[in-house]
Amino acid sequence: MLPLPTDLPEPELSRNTAVVLQKRYQRKNPDGSLEETPRDLFWRVAAAIAAQEAAYQSPYSPEALAREFYELMTSWKFLPNSPTLMNAGTDLGQLSACFVLPVGDSIEEIFDAVKYAAMIHKSGGGTGFSFSRLRPRDSRVGSTGGVASGPVSFLRIFNTATEQIKQGGTRRGANMGILRVDHPDILQFIRAKEKEGEFNNFNLSVGLTEAFMQAVEKDAPYDLRDPHTGEVAHRLRAREVFDLLVKKAWQSGDPGIVFLDRINRDNPTPDQGEIESTNPCGEQPLLPFEACNLGSVNLARFFTPGHENEADPARNGVDWTELARVVHLAVRFLDNVIDASRFPLEIITETVRKNRKIGLGVMGFADLLFQLNVPYDSPEGLALGERLMAFIQEEGHKASAQLAQERGPFPAYGSSVYAARKAGPYRNATVTTIAPTGTLSIIAGCSSGVEPLFALCFTRNILDGERLLEVNPYFEAALAQAGMCSPEIMEAVAAKGSVKDLDFLPEDLRRVFVTAMDMAPVWHLRMQAAFQRHTDNAVSKTVNLPHEATEKDIFDIYWLAYKEGCKGVTVYRDGCKSVQVLATGEGQKAMEQNQGAAQAADPGADATGEPQPLPQEAPTPSLSAGVRRRPDILWGFTQKVPTGLGTMYLTVNEVEGCPFEVFATIGKSGHSITAKAEAIGRLVSLALRSGVNVRDVIAQLKGIGGEHPVFRHKGLLLSIPDAIAWALENHYLHGEHVGMVSDIQGQVCPECGEALLFQEGCLTCPACGFSRCS
């Protein structure tokens, strides 16, 4: 590797960037101590990628280009995907994030795919599969005389294998499973995730065809075909299947949808086969045994001050010259990654280098809009998004054409659609992709992908249970400019995460600083479509919906995605998974009502789609059934409470509006006090989960004395248990809801305990950078 230059500047790191780099990317010694600094890390990556120039007649020397790549990354204008940051310049050397593997119809082919997936997950990649080639359940198997298990049964094997790799690897395996809508087992597949926790290592999507969508529009039947024989196995009404897709997405967010015919219309190498699947987050359609390496340009870094209020924000306020320079360097970087990467299978190496697909995308779009004073949900916002991506697409293809002159086109160019159109030649079969950037955006200090901000403020866990208020810097600057930057205002914003209903703030500020849940869902979809129109591959984007959204809202989003030319869409209704709770008492009653409603709409089916026998008499519950199980998803609030031992943050999560569990943390109090607070929280939680009324809990805790009482505006707080009682009493008995610091809704981060956000088709933690996908 090229030696580290002594004059190389140190990267400027925020606290968040430093923490994420140290935890996830900097190499460590066997004892866990850090082997490299952030400067070492970025030079390792830059040098390893620039070294590939030596194989070509390049205008750059490897040393000079390594410096440019280093500056590109440490200025936070561009970052490659996580496997490149982790593995470039290491012995592993696997630098790609996305792979697609074929699943054939024989046992040998199926378990080859399981083995190959394990190898890819071990190396840090994610995998996509189509199960559409598998013969349907209960089909006759000629070689044995038995019957086929069907796609969903084998899907469970893939999920279990991934679970084992997750336990041993440094990066969690992620999968996409796709089944064509005309497969005979499609109803079972759509219902596969009805039971929460099933197939938790998979994103599932239904592959919709043009024939199916036309049948939906006409409310006509369509054919289900046995993939083994090609014969029509059954017919279903398309509208009923589409409505079932909508219902399941409303209930749990799964499955998503992809438009397979539309994807294949944009397949640049159709002679090599049909595209059947995508990567786990859905933005990268790939051929079997193909991989793609991704990278993202940080649009927030291309704002030009002084132009933000001009009449045409789609053309002003952006440094287009610098953006073009960065795009050209980024395309060269990503093309070099193909040569630098060591793939886990030889057939993947051959396929990747034959087509040389790259995926250059963006992040920081919402932050750029903030700087330009342009609302996300506005015609101006759409115009800017489309203009930016059209520019990146044009410059990206120019850069790929220049590389083709320098290095030769991708080997499959001669039989590609480009050659037939006399376009190019190009070095890369595809150039652009809008990928999830959850962890990368934390490193770069910007908003994720093309998503709007989920919250303007949120609280972050730091050492010893202390919590720190995080505020979007552009929002904070706008408040300061308006003379309204105060701790009280920040607390008010943090309580909601949004300024939509804070009438004491200026209207123009509230209009610009919109968040994901502030806007009508249609704006999410329109923005996705604006970027899709100028993207070779696809766009990873989540349409966030409020909890009260209806099935019709999701139907409209799906239909608009089809009409607007999107290649797929993922919706997530806030808190949708929390209705599936295993509980007793009132919680059980509510759950049974939910299940009853679901069965009325979808009678006779369980999570496998199998008809169910008549219910039997329920067994007598055991004593252990008295403690309700904790569901994976809860929502609640965090209350800031002063105590004589430090500020306590009391988090209360609820089921059906009733307290279910309590966590108490006290900052800067020492481990002994922290342990006592945790113990009290655990015991209170056990009582609540065992059916003890919150009034009784309050009565037991209230008035317990301590050594360090403090005065509150409504009385004296004597101790930690007394403070917990005070907070519960004010919230549940008096209904005051005072001092709320943050709303929590969704799944919990397994690494830091913060609430996960569902965006860009992926669960991501805004606090520590954990991501299911990156």
Predicted segments — roles?
Residues 1-95, 101, 242-246, 251, ...:
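Acidic/polar, glycine-rich intrinsically disordered N-terminal extensions of enzymes
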Residues 6-11, 96-320, 343-347, 400-403, ...:
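Active-site cavity-forming subdomains of large catalytic enzyme subunits
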Residues 15, 283-285, 334-339, 409, ...:
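Catalytic alpha/beta core of large soluble enzyme barrels
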Residues 85-95, 99-100, 106-130, 178-180, ...:
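Conserved phosphate/anionic-ligand binding catalytic regions in large, soluble enzymes, centered on
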Residues 111-120, 135, 146-159, 192-206, ...:
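Extended active-site and interfacial segments that coordinate phosphate-rich ligands
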Residues 326-349, 353, 374-437, 507-511, ...:
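Internal maturation/activation junctions in enzymes
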Residues 584-647, 751:
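Short, Gly/Pro- and small/polar-rich lid/capping loops
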Residues 749-752, 765-768:
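Short cysteine-rich clusters marking metal-coordination/redox-active sites
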